[in-house]
Amino acid sequence: MGGEGPGSDDIVKKMAQLMMQGAVMLDKTCPADGLPLFKLKTGDVVCPVHGKVVIVASDEEARDVEVEEIIREVRYRAARNVMKGLEEDNVDTVSKWLGVLETAERILAIRRGSRQGQGSVRGEGRESK
């Protein structure tokens, strides 16, 4: 962790702010910077610098999380490009990116269905059972 770098006072302030809001400091650290992680009242685990962190127990879970993040990014970019195509009245662009968006949505639905069939749900915006 170290308290000597630039912005370390801001990090300490953010950590104190999290604790004043009822967050609990965990015995786990952020893989990116080694800072302690905090569990919010909502159950989310956050790094004071990076925000929300997903904790995984295996390499397979890590791959699943990585794939989910990639698909989310593809969805975001596709939606942005659809909007751009609409603004430019470019039917070809809209059609192309709607296809990408539909494929990403289909992949997510299949992945969610297969995980629910296994009895576990992981990831952002879904409850753990």
Curated annotation (Swiss-Prot):
Organism annotation: Aeropyrum pernix (strain ATCC 700893 / DSM 11879 / JCM 9820 / NBRC 100138 / K1)
NCBIfam families reported for this sequence: PRK00420.1-4
InterPro entries: SSSCA1 (IPR009563), UPF0148 (IPR022954)
Protein's recorded name: UPF0148 protein APE_0207
Signal peptide: none
Family note: Belongs to the UPF0148 family.
